[in-house]
């Protein structure tokens, strides 16, 4: 029987790459893992891939290009680092391979599956922003659909144990990329992103706070409905994504103005949304919702590409 699933490569055998491999192998009807790529021959991810019968290389992207399996690769997930992504992308694009970038490199357009995938379905490189971006930008977008968002601020709190060397090396890129995507994808006029590595034991699941500053006359019921519908949409591919409590509203009145970036001292309406993200526990512990939402979003994008009929590359 023929196997019509799209063959993908995963570059990076750490937490994100390994979780993504297991998600695809367990759940995907449209994709198959054609190669797992690392640089540490002793990594758990490469060892696990070998046990599962996945072709592997510990020679990085150059090793991937030399693999017989590379001829069938149509999409490559990059789960390494922002610095390495530029090199990987150049080499893969030369062979017509679509790249789904799970680093903050932002070479391609920012994509949040529930917000703007359809606009970038044919992009050769798709950037998945960051874990904090995947969790919070849908909420900023949900508010901005109802009322102009003058300023949005997100705070992503993740367990220190879930932050591997790649995450820690990309902290500056995380804040920069997420802040830009709050504007470009979320629709806010101004934005800021903060990440907190929480050392608490036992480890806590990912928690995110989204603040949006809107005009005082904004429709509270419409904002609440829009946010709740967006949460349901994200839950379709991240079941552990949820509101921690009801959407909160605070009227900022004359005499109690707040200093809003880009606006100065202002009155208006402050919208606060509190989220938590529990991981599915495929490879990573359930507290690592920050990694789970990235792999789930990346998988969703790849499956939509596979099911879209858009031509994908690779050597013939």
Swiss-Prot record:
Reaction it catalyzes: acetaldehyde + NAD(+) + CoA = acetyl-CoA + NADH + H(+)
Top-tier EC class: oxidoreductase
Residues at which NAD(+) binds: 13-16, 162-170, 290
Q: Which residues form the active site?
A: 131
Keyword set, alphabetical order? Aromatic hydrocarbons catabolism, NAD, Oxidoreductase
Identify the EC number(s): 1.2.1.10
GO biological process terms, alphabetically, are: catabolic process
**Which Gene Ontology molecular function entries are recorded, alphabetically?**
acetaldehyde dehydrogenase (acetylating) activity; NAD binding
Family per record: Belongs to the acetaldehyde dehydrogenase family.
> According to its UniProt entry, what is the function of this protein?
Catalyzes the conversion of acetaldehyde to acetyl-CoA, using NAD(+) and coenzyme A. Is the final enzyme in the meta-cleavage pathway for the degradation of 2-aminophenol.
The protein's name is Acetaldehyde dehydrogenase
Question: Taxonomy-wise, where does this protein's organism fall, top ranks first?
Answer: Bacteria, Pseudomonadati, Pseudomonadota, Gammaproteobacteria, Pseudomonadales
């Amino acid at each position: 029987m023929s196997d019509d699933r799209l063959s993908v490569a995963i570059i990076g055998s750490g937490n994100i790459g390994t979780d993504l491999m297991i998600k695809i192998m367990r759940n995907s009807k449209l994709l198959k893992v054609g190669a797992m790529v690392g640089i540490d021959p002793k990594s758990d991810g490469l060892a696990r891939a070998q046990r599962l019968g996945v072709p592997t290389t510990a020679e990085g992207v150059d090793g991937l290009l030399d693999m017989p399996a590379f001829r069938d690769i149509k999409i490559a997930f990059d789960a390494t680092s922002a610095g390495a992504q530029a090199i990987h992308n150049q080499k893969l694009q030369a062979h017509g391979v679509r790249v789904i970038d799970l680093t903050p490199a932002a070479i391609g357009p920012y994509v949040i599956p529930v917000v703007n995938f359809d606009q970038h379905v044919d992009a050769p490189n798709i950037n998945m922003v960051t874990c904090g971006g995947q969790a919070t930008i849908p909420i900023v977008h949900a508010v901005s659909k109802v009322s102009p968002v003058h300023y949005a601020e997100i705070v992503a709190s993740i367990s220190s144990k879930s932050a591997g060397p790649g995450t820690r090396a990309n902290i500056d890129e995380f804040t920069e990329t997420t802040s830009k995507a709050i504007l470009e994808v979320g629709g806010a006029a101004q934005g800021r992103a903060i990440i907190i590595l929480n050392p608490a034991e036992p480890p806590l699941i990912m928690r995110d706070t989204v603040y949006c500053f809107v005009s005082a006359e904004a429709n509270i019921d419409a904002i609440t409905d829009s946010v709740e519908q967006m949460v349901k949409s994200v839950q379709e591919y991240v079941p552990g994504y949820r509101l921690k409590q009801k959407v909160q509203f605070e009227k900022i009145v004359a005499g109690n103005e707040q200093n809003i970036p880009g606006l100065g001292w202002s009155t208006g309406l402050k919208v606060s949304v509190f989220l938590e993200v529990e991981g599915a526990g495929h490879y990573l512990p359930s507290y690592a919702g920050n990694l789970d939402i990235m792999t789930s979003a990346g998988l969703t994008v790849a499956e939509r590409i596979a099911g879209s009929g858009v031509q994908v590359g690779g050597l013939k």
